[in-house]
Amino acid sequence: EDVFEKFKDVKLILLGVGGVGSFALDALYNTGIKNITIVDFDTYEESNLNRQMGSFGNIGRIKVEALKEKYPEVTPIHIKITPEWIDDFDFSSYDYILDAIDDVKPKVHLIKKHFTKIISTSGGAKRIDPSKIEYISIWDTYNDPFIKKIRTELKAQGFKKKFKVIFSSELPMCLEKGSFE
């Protein structure tokens, strides 16, 4: 019970509330963590309906605003996550930074700047087997083209520090968005 009390008082910032980030938000919020800031710039589109929390009934709406209604204690920030925004934003009051960014440049910048308090994820698109989700060093990931791009860019920029990422080792299962042929 002491662990739960300590955990629920954690202050988190979640960057990206798409397919991975929205489910992370739902899981964290429903376990009692309420002090969560969510950051995203996107609006819900029809293609989000089968893979993003909060999308049903909210097509065309700003994601963080719709999620604020679903999870009333979160703090929404509607802004595009860029390297410049990362440089300007004060992350010091957060215990953890949850990285669900799906854009290489800001993701790499965030990792380089804040890798000691980051929990970084890859995407879940085209994957269906939850038993393939792993939490390992970014340098040991495989079968994930997005994380490979991140590794390649980090290496190109001389970043060699160790940190773990959440990713799926499953090979992508479908040819296009929403198609499991």
PLM feature segments, named:
Residues E1-E181:
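Adenine nucleotide-associated cytosolic modules
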